[in-house]
Every structure is written in C-alpha cells, then in structure tokens.
C-alpha cells in the first residue's frame, strides 16, 4: 500500500512539474509575440493582428511607448490611413523630444513626419519637420536621413509650383549620396534618380529626364 501511495505521489509531482514547465514555455512563447522585432516582421502582412499585439504590448509594457507609437504609425501608413499614421508618428516624436535620450530615433520620426505631411499636402508642416530634421541629421552625421529630408523639401517645392527650387533640392539630395558605399544609400540614390526623372517627365522635360543619372 505504501508503495502505491508513493507511486501516486510521485506521479502527481511529475504532472505538477510538467504542467509548470508547459505553462512557462507557453508564457515565453506568448511574450515573444509582444516584441518590436516580431511585430515589425508581421505588420505588413497582418496589420490588424499587429495592432492587437501592440495594444497587448502597451498593457504588458514589453515595448517602450515611443516604439509602440512608431509601429502603430507604420501599420496605419501601410493601410493608407495617413492621418492616423501622422498622429502616432507625432506621439512618438513628442516622447523623444521630451526625453532627448535617443536622438537617432527622434531623427527617424522627424523624417517620417516630413514624409507623411507631404502625403497629406500639409506643406508648411512638412517643411518645418524637414528643416529641423536636416540640422539634427547633420549633427548625427546621417547622410541618408539628410538626403531624404532634402528630397522632401524638393517635393514640397514642386507641389507648390516652385519647380526650379524643387530641382535644386532634388540635386542636393542626390549629390549628398553620390559615391556612397552603403547598399541602403545606393538604393536610396537610385530611388531619387527615378523620382527626379518622373518629375521631369511630368513637366514635359523629357530631354533632361533622359540625362538623369548619366
């Protein structure tokens, strides 16, 4: 009888330990979903799920709030909900502005706000963020961010019909990246060439468009 009792007790202990380990594994697995790395991977394909996970991450405090707002902005931008994308980008930007602990992230959000404001045709706001961002980019020695912001100024100028000024800024953005060895910056440079060509064609300046990049 004692052996039977010991066997039952050992079996119960085994079940208890097994269940605890299983629960721990599930907790780790669930928590791994509430990370910026995981959400960054899935938000384009699963935007609604990404937003739900971001809500969970905010309540669990697994991701800093400024990063949560940044990711929400990216999700909404991917869904073509530009006003919401701008709203959350600005929330992230304001948190960075107050803390001043991560100027690189502040610069990222400044670039995003300048781009989103262009999409909303809010040229005054876009120019303000772009000009502020250029100063910060120069301080951080970030040519990629600086060139993006120069190009955004050019787009604002073009949309406001200051065409020659626009092309000057396009050229400044391109010149800044010429000779780069960074793959990301080379891709950006190709994008700028393509966009400048599109603007020239739109202005019926086909000869100049053909000369772009030569």
Pin down the residues of each PLM region.
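A "functional boundary" signal
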Residues: 23-214
